[in-house]
């Protein structure tokens, strides 16, 4: 698939870029999984979670670059958007593969993705422990 992509787009795929893309895509998937897990934990606590899910989807599409490219936003807002986990999930892997992200920023973005993974995992761990202490179980 990557060879076909390279042929169609004309972008030469160097091994470092492919490895960076694979790492970034896996980290993006992990961030997405952790958000899904967190939303699942929230559904245990709250009866009506649909509004939170809709809000999450809206943020993901807006700040992930699905609705509008990040470059369409004002420069000050762009600087904030690139720090969000939504950008780390969607835009970073595609920017690496399409060579839109300069090589000197790839490592920074991979580190930012790792930061989001660690932060979400830590928050989930703490929230889950607190949630399970107050949960009531019924049945056998």
Features from the language model and the residues they span:
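Alpha-helical transmembrane segments and their short interhelical loops
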Residues: 1-53, 107-115, 119-122
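Helix-loop junctions at the membrane-solvent interface of multi-pass transporters
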Residues: 6-8, 67, 97, 126
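Transmembrane alpha-helical segments that form the membrane-embedded catalytic/substrate-channel core
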Residues: 29-41, 62-67, 71, 122-131
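Transmembrane helix segments
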Residues: 39, 44-96
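Membrane-interface alpha-helices
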Residues: 94-106
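Junction motif at the cytosolic side of a transmembrane helix
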Residues: 97, 114-140
């Amino acid at each position: 698939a990557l060879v076909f992509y390279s042929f169609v787009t004309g972008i030469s795929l160097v091994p470092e870029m492919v490895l960076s893309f694979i790492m970034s895509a896996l980290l993006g998937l992990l961030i997405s999984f952790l958000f899904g897990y967190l939303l699942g934990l929230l559904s245990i606590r709250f009866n009506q979670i649909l509004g939170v899910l809709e809000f999450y989807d809206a943020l993901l599409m807006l700040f992930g670059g699905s609705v509008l490219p990040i470059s369409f936003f004002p420069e000050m807002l762009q600087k904030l958007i690139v720090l969000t986990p939504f950008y780390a999930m969607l835009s970073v892997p595609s920017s690496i593969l399409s060579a839109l992200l300069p090589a000197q920023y790839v490592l920074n973005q991979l580190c930012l993705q790792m930061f989001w993974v660690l932060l979400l995992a830590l928050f989930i761990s703490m929230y889950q422990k607190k949630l399970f202490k107050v949960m009531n179980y019924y049945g056998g």
